[in-house]
A protein has these predicted regions:
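Beta-strand-rich binding/interaction modules
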Residues: 121, 207-242, 249-251, 561-608, ...
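Substrate-binding/catalytic cleft of secreted carbohydrate-active enzymes
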Residues: 330, 336-339, 345-537, 541, ...
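Active-site-adjacent substrate/metal-binding segments within catalytic domains
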Residues: 66-97, 101-110, 114-121, 127-130, ...
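Accessory beta-strand-rich segments of carbohydrate-active enzymes
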Residues: 24-26, 32-34, 40-47, 61, ...
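An acidic-aromatic loop/edge-strand motif
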Residues: 36, 61-64, 69, 73-78, ...
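Beta-strand/loop-rich accessory regions of lumenal/periplasmic or secreted enzymes
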Residues: 112, 159, 262, 626-629, ...
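Accessory carbohydrate-binding/adhesion or oligomerization-edge regions at the termini
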Residues: 22-77, 96, 156-165, 230-233, ...
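Substrate-binding clefts and catalytic carboxylate motifs of secreted carbohydrate-active enzymes
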Residues: 32-51, 56-57, 62-65, 86, ...
């Protein structure tokens, strides 16, 4: 026995304080989680570090400890492998059992082992081999123990099951396949007569029913039931309940004035049951419970405590890059908080999660769909029957668990459906995720118009258990608003679950190169969060779309009186429990020139919210101070009753031309700017800046500023339209030099104006020259428009960052305009590939499209320049995000980008969500050009400042 294992044995003996008369004593043989492990002896049969005894941390996945071989579960599909890795693991641990435990019943418990498990104590097999990697199981080892002596625990683990249906259910799957003891191992010591298990049904009226399993009962037993609130100081009467000698019996009692559990108000109680004989406590157990009533009404909805619910949910894997499926309470609490931060109220899995995750869902408030594994194949009836019981027995008392899932996408066994109710006194429904089954339609990845007599056009309650697939930067937030609003029109809509919570990129202990984390290309890079919970842009989109406080769209103009229309989108909570505060922010005039200039608060305060029950819309009013319009944008932050930020909304207080006039620096210069033309070249020249245009193309071919050539060239090229130069006209407007270029095609004309101080103004008029009868000539635009504007070339090399005034800080898509807000955003250059740059994952990404662009200072050393928009609702295109390098054929990383590197656009493309854009909602679709004779055309006005010596002093 190695030193570390021996020390653990001594520690166990020295520190265990056994009180065997009443309570169950829990003795940890492993650590509680992978972040706090214990060390066991270990050997693996094949792969890395195989064939020799060493040590391993428990709990853990052995691959993450440097043993065996990594396998992804689509080994039989895209990965084209003949078979998965099939190594075996051998564990040993010496421990001492105190003599004082003799006469008690001792069981050993495994929280989860992948995949088949045989357990020996002192050389003897303690029970039948366990099959299935996601379930808690136990053995009675009393007869195998030596009390007061050293005992030897041996655990033989097969990564690949000997039962075909287990492999088909768990190991032919779209997830990583690991091996080992990855959840805790512990002993429980109980008196011979004891409460073995309870299954509780606690209703909203305070009534409680519990199925109690007893070991060695007798006629003269009673139970004393106590109820203790986790918060507050209420006291409840202790109830005395007579028992019979049956091993399974149902007890019932009731308390008045209990506080109910729901995800917005997750009130919890400790239920303490004391088993007494002749007035003496024989055994006692405690269970954390919540009082709530579930009502599943077909062709109507799902009700909690009498309220019809809508689940705003996401799917989640139990996963951490350095732990595989071995996680920790810290990670579980963090994950539930992040899910709640997105204003979600529900979560689903592909297998039973860690118990500490369910405990966090109970205490912080999430609905849970708890799933029997079976990715696309089900368990055989014999194996599945045992696993259903193990799953339900462990999870039945969690108030967060509201639905049982049997398998996924065909991975069910109809013979197991009734087994759930045999162990569940609450009679939760059993669904088959992705099927329209037994009155519940959970179809996966619906199109916007799904379907023929289903969803909004059908008669069954519907809640897609997977939708808005998030590969790379796809889905999740992109298109969510359309889908959600469309489905919400139906009274049969009960919610949905997006795929998926986080990228499943695992640390490869067997890799020696620069890459350290593996998501198997696009197969496991589906998260709204990175593997270490880095927030992608869709995180904030979901946060806004699913916020329980919703503002009616409104623009703030000079007539603004401080009022908004606000809807209470909670399920259970009154609007008046929400705290709301505002700030009016002002950008300094030097913002684009001095990186140290910070926005300042003009005025701030609180907004009183009225009484409004869920579903009601009310007018709210904020004070409008005399200096209100001195500010540039308004921020309103809502915080829920628990102190969690709901969202911060922003509104611009002025139009783009106001900001351009305010933010661009003007110098007094006596000398006039000049315009000259020489063959194919027009030169606009001021004292500091020279701009040269090609008269054949209309493109900038050179920008010179104080002996610096700034490579902002080869534009404006039209995007989404065609244009050819017709004529060039030079004029002098006072001290300003003017070049007007008229075009045939989509652009009517572009006017360039050089000011004496070096400022350059560009005004484009497009889509103007419609025919009187036939409308605009289609030869001059490119059909359906998903990209429209102008573009320029600019080298990416040397770019350091940008000071951006507009909506950010994340890039956006046509169908993902929520979750981005007005502000001054300092963005450092990065090359993050969304869902792939795991070694250097910097969010927000730098490259992409930015909405409501107002001003920017592009920092690129000697090539730096500034640009200001006089036009509202303009998108800035800032380079092109790098394509994912590791995706499999058929993956769709992003839509095509326009030519060039820096673009100014009125239309940008949408992002996919598993299905093609044509099957998404309205905001994902391309625009159509509509123009008639007499229209003014579309104007785009920009200011460029290529100067380097602007000094506000």
């Amino acid at each position: 026995m190695n030193l570390k294992t021996r020390l653990f044995s001594i520690f166990l003996l020295a520190t265990s304080s056994f009180v065997f008369a009443q309570q169950t004593d829990k003795i940890m043989l492993s650590g509680p989680d992978f972040e706090h492990p214990k060390t066991w002896d270990f050997k693996v049969s094949e792969g890395n570090n195989s064939g020799k005894w060493s040590i391993i941390e428990v709990p853990s996945q052995w691959e993450l400890q440097g043993f065996g071989e990594y396998t992804y579960g689509r080994w039989y599909k895209e990965l084209e492998q003949d078979e998965p890795s099939k190594e075996e693991g051998f564990y040993k641990l010496d421990f001492e059992m105190p003599a004082s435990a003799k006469g008690q019943l001792v069981t050993i418990h495994f929280g989860g082992v992948m995949t088949d498990t045989e357990v020996k104590v002192n050389g003897e097999v303690v029970g039948p081999k366990h099959h299935g990697g996601f379930y808690e199981f136990e053995y009675d080892i009393t007869e195998f123990l030596k009390f007061g002596e050293e005992n030897i625990l041996e655990v033989h683990v097969w990564k690949h099951s000997e039962i075909g249906s287990v492999n088909n259910a768990e190991r032919k799957a779209d997830w990583w396949l690991f091996g080992g003891i990855y959840r805790p191992v512990w002993l429980e010591v109980k008196p011979q007569t004891h409460i073995d298990h309870i299954a509780v049904d606690a209703q909203m009226d305070g009534s409680l029913k519990a199925v109690v399993d007893l070991v060695n009962p007798s006629e003269d037993l009673k139970i004393l039931a106590s109820l203790i609130p986790l918060e507050g100081n209420e006291t409840f009467e202790v109830k005395t309940i007579d028992l019979t000698a049956e091993t399974e019996q149902t007890i019932a009692t009731q308390w008045s004035e209990v506080k109910l559990w729901d995800p917005e108000n997750p009130n919890l109680y400790t239920l303490k049951l004391k088993l007494q004989k002749n007035g003496k406590t024989v055994h006692e157990v405690s269970e954390r419970i919540g009082f709530r009533t579930l009502d599943f009404r077909k062709r109507d909805g799902i009700y909690l405590n009498g309220t019809k619910i809508v689940m705003k949910g996401i799917n989640r894997h139990s996963f951490w890059p350095e732990g595989g499926r071995s996680t920790s309470k810290r990670i579980s609490v963090m994950d539930v908080n992040l899910i709640k931060d997105m204003n979600m109220n529900a979560v689903r899995f592909h297998y039973p999660p860690d118990d500490h995750f369910l405990a966090a869902c109970d205490s912080l408030g999430l609905f849970v769909l708890d799933e029997l594994a079976g990715w696309q194949n089900g368990y055989d009836t014999k194996t599945g029957t045992q696993l259903v019981q193990e799953m339900v027995d462990r999870d039945v008392n969690h108030p967060s668990v509201i639905i049982w899932d049997q398998g996924n996408e065909g991975g069910w066994n109809y013979e197991l459906d009734d087994d759930f109710q045999q162990h569940d006194p609450q009679n939760r429904i059993v669904i088959h995720p992705w099927s329209n089954y037994n009155g519940w339609d959970t179809h996966h990845y619906p199109t916007y118009l799904t379907g023929v007599h289903r969803f909004g056009s059908g008669e069954n309650v519907f809640f897609p258990t997977e939708f808005m697939h998030g590969t790379y930067d796809n889905g999740i937030g992109a298109g969510l608003k359309d889908f959600w609003e469309h489905y919400s029109e139906s009274p049969l809509f009960a919610g949905g679950f997006m795929w998926v919570y986080s990228d499943e990129a695992v640390l490869r202990t067997d890799w020696t190169g620069e890459e350290k984390f593996d998501s198997k290309g696009n197969l496991a890079s589906d998260g709204v969060l990175g593997p270490h919970r880095e927030k992608e842009g869709s995180f904030y989109t979901v946060k806004e779309v699913w916020a329980p406080v919703q503002f009616k769209p409104q623009a703030i103009t000079e007539t603004f009186d401080g009022s908004f229309l606000v809807t209470n989108a909670y399920l259970f909570t009154n609007l008046n429990t929400v705290k709301m505060n505002y700030r009016v922010m002002e950008a300094g005039a030097e913002t684009m020139y001095n990186p140290n200039t910070k926005a300042t608060v003009v005025t701030s305060g609180a907004i009183d919210l009225p009484h409004a029950v869920p579903g009601e819309t009310r007018k709210i009013t904020m004070p409008v101070a005399a200096n209100f319009f001195k500010g540039d944008w308004l921020e309103i932050t809502a915080t829920d009753q628990h102190g969690r930020e709901i969202y911060t909304w922003t509104w611009a207080l002025h139009k783009a031309d106001y900001f351009a006039d305010k933010l661009i620096y003007q110098e007094a210069v006596k000398k006039s700017a000049k315009a000259t033309q020489d063959e194919n070249l027009v030169t606009l020249k001021s004292e500091k800046v020279t701009l040269k245009l090609n008269t054949k193309t209309g493109y900038i071919i050179e920008v010179n500023s104080q002996k610096r050539n700034i490579p902002f060239v080869n534009g404006p090229k039209p995007i989404g339209m065609k244009a050819e130069v017709e004529k060039v006209t030079l004029t002098q407007d006072g001290k300003n030099a003017v070049c007007r270029i008229d075009y045939n095609g989509g652009i009517d004309h572009i006017t360039w104006t050089m000011y004496p101080d070096g400022r350059v103004h560009m005004e484009m008029i497009a889509l103007k020259n419609a025919g009187r009868n036939s409308g605009f000539d289609g030869a001059f635009y490119e059909g359906d428009i998903d990209k429209f504007g102008i573009t320029f070339d600019f080298p990416e090399e040397g770019v350091e960052g940008i000071t951006l005034f507009g909506r950010g800080p994340y890039h956006t898509w046509r169908n993902r305009l929520q979750g981005i807000e007005y502000g001054i955003w300092e963005k450092e250059y990065n090359t993050t590939i969304t869902g792939e740059s795991f070694e250097n994952m910097i969010y927000p990404e730098f490259k992409g499209f930015y909405a409501n662009f107002l001003a920017g200072n592009l920092q690129a050393g000697d090539n730096s320049f500034k640009v200001f928009s006089e036009s509202d609702k303009l998108f800035l295109r800032l380079f092109t995000p790098d394509e994912a390098q590791n995706g499999f054929r058929g993956s769709h990383f992003q839509p095509s980008f326009p030519p060039g590197n820096i673009s100014f656009m009125y239309e940008i493309p949408g992002q996919r969500a598993f299905k093609p854009l044509s099957q998404q909602g309205p905001s994902s679709q391309p625009s159509n050009i509509r123009i008639k004779s007499g229209d003014d055309g579309i104007s785009m006005k920009l200011w460029f400042d290529f100067r380097t010596d602007v000094d506000f002093k």
